[in-house]
Amino acid sequence: LKDGPCPSYMDTCCLSPDRR
């Protein structure tokens, strides 16, 4: 999963941000 703002709200990192 990429880190940072996503271009689309349907992005996986937007739905479930894996920043831990």
From Swiss-Prot:
What's an example GO BP annotation here? innate immune response
Q: Name one GO cellular component term.
A: extracellular region
Molecular-function annotations in GO: serine-type peptidase activity
Judging by the UniProt lineage, the source's domain of life is Eukaryota
Q: What is its main location?
A: secreted
> What EC designation does it have?
3.4.21.-
Q: Give UniProt keywords alphabetically.
A: Hydrolase, Immunity, Innate immunity, Protease, Secreted, Serine protease
Q: What is the annotated localization of this protein?
A: Secreted
- Sequence similarity: Belongs to the peptidase S1 family.
Protein task: Binds the A.niger cell wall component alpha-1,3-glucan, a fungal pathogen-associated molecular pattern (PAMP) that activates the host immune response.
Protein's UniProt name? Putative serine protease
